[in-house]
Amino acid sequence: MGFSRTKIISNGGGTNPLGYTGAINLGPVEFNKINKAPKNGYIEDEVSFGNLINKELSDWYTYRTRTHNIESKNNVYLIKLNNNRFMKMRILNYYCGKKDQDCRTIMCSRQQAACLTVEYVLAKNGTDIFPISKFDSNASLTTESPLNIN
């Protein structure tokens, strides 16, 4: 997976012809209700107008024109990794140390931007079954959040 501010690519297809990583966007469903990954249907990266894009991952946020802030749609994504493992993930936040709702009415600074907080769970090795996530998305964001990508 590659992250660059709001752009996410999967390292499969147009990005890496030898990588078979792809994604499925399930929309804003309950994270822990997704307990099994399908074997097929994963969309890989493609080249579109000279840019790499994964159409399943490109629409993960809403841009707020009034505050100029990025707000996660809280979609759940299934990812098939190169090593035939499966992962489910959702982006919880775009701003370091702040919850999305803290940035809805005020402008969060550029220094706080592009510090994604991602909830993710890997399927048990050799299976397509996901264990239940122990992360509480209502908890305060700290350095102990599931995955902070700077």
Regions found by a protein language model. Give the residues of each.
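Surface-exposed, beta-sheet-biased, low-hydrophobicity segments with strongly acidic/polar composition
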Residues: M1-N150
